[in-house]
Amino acid sequence: MHMPKGFLSFGINIGIKDDTKDFGVIYSEIPCKATAVFTKNNFPGAPVIVGKEHVRSGVLQAIVINSKNSNVATGEKGIQNSREICKIIGESLDIKETLVLPSSTGVIGVPLKMEIILPACKKAKSLLKPGNLEEVAEAIMTTDTRKKISSRNIKTKSGQGTIYGIAKGAGMIEPNMATMLCYILSDVSLPEGTDLYSILKSSVDQSFNCLTIDSDTSTSDTVALLCNGLSGESSVQDFSKALTEICIDLTKLIATDGEGATKLIELTISGAKSEAQARKIGKSILNSPLVKTAIYGGDPNWGRLIMAVGKVFDEPIPFEGLQIYFGTLPVKEANPETLKKLSEYLKNNTEISLNVVLNVGTISMKFWGCDFTEKYIEENAYYTT
């Protein structure tokens, strides 16, 4: 997997909670054109507050991330701590603190262990290495069971460039910007005047904002995009296509790694009258505990799907025209033989294709989620104990 030119990084353990990696830094040798989208939760974490201020200029050069503690609901002190982290990282890397994007993920309401984090910040420069982004992908994990990485190579005027994305997320996932963190790094540039935010927002709306694990929107969601341009200029069309593909890859990896999940669900809503209608109904289906547990248990209980469509009160769908399929098998009013095949399909596959045809329009959208198992409860009932 190709790495973008000019980015150095590291991921290490500094003992925030246990002996797994919990601290990472990404640094570009030159300032990057940058943009980001953040959580819409009304109680954003301190790093989100500071990060919004720093990305406003459209230029970033470094990202500093800690896991195992989100620095959320920590008051003014938490904001001061995020600023101090950026300041010390800036001093270590010899860049302005406003060129540093802070991120934190983990337990809410617990002050950061600054006595551990600041010494790590001070020695950041000495730890940086090229081609080391997989370490960061590991360092940002909390309840994740695997690293989440995707990349694409794209043509540039001078040859070839790379877009490389890493993400974390397994629970408290229903992004709306946009716990989910994603950092996308590229060594390409785009034509002067290109609206980088609009490009990122479009990709996020087609991917992360179509994802739900448990319907809880994190206080820390962040998707950041940094482009240093060292491999030359690409077309907006090629860049946008590759960026969206990466975001969808990472979205599916997050859904597959949902806390306790055994099955990835890819839901297609088609025949909708609008994107808003498709989004409401798609999220209603994938957020339904009854639907998610039925898929886990291999129970083709199509009444639960009818319920999930029907409970979107402001988007009534005529029952007669509604069609529902698992794979290619029709679900609605299925006979005993089809129900048996449906149960086998659900039990024997780890990737479930669910298609809901509304037949009221021409809009089609994809959404991603996962099943709901006993292990999700085990994971979250004792998270801080």
UniProtKB/Swiss-Prot annotation:
It is found in: Cytoplasm. It catalyses: N(2)-acetyl-L-ornithine + L-glutamate = N-acetyl-L-glutamate + L-ornithine; L-glutamate + acetyl-CoA = N-acetyl-L-glutamate + CoA + H(+). Gene3D superfamilies: ArgJ beta chain, C-terminal domain, L-amino peptidase D-ALA esterase/amidase. GO terms for molecular function: glutamate N-acetyltransferase activity; L-glutamate N-acetyltransferase activity. Pathway: Amino-acid biosynthesis; L-arginine biosynthesis; L-ornithine and N-acetyl-L-glutamate from L-glutamate and N(2)-acetyl-L-ornithine (cyclic): step 1/1; Amino-acid biosynthesis; L-arginine biosynthesis; N(2)-acetyl-L-ornithine from L-glutamate: step 1/4. Its EC number is 2.3.1.35, 2.3.1.1. One of its GO terms (biological process) is L-arginine biosynthetic process. Substrate binds at T142, K168, T179, E259, N380, T385. Pfam families: ArgJ. The active site is at T179 (nucleophile). Signal peptide: none annotated. InterPro entries: Arg_biosynth_ArgJ, ArgJ-like_dom_sf, ArgJ_beta_C. The record marks A178, T179 as: Cleavage. The keyword Transport does not apply. Keywords: Acyltransferase, Amino-acid biosynthesis, Arginine biosynthesis, Autocatalytic cleavage, Cytoplasm, Multifunctional enzyme, Transferase. One of its GO terms (cellular component) is cytoplasm. It comes from the Bacteria. The record marks T105, G106 as: Involved in the stabilization of negative charge on the oxyanion by the formation of the oxyanion hole. NCBIfam families: ArgJ, PRK05388.1. Heterotetramer of two alpha and two beta chains. Catalyzes two activities which are involved in the cyclic version of arginine biosynthesis: the synthesis of N-acetylglutamate from glutamate and acetyl-CoA as the acetyl donor, and of ornithine by transacetylation between N(2)-acetylornithine and glutamate. HAMAP family: ArgJ. Belongs to the ArgJ family. This is Arginine biosynthesis bifunctional protein ArgJ. The lineage of its organism: Bacteria, Pseudomonadati, Spirochaetota, Spirochaetia, Leptospirales. The gene is argJ.
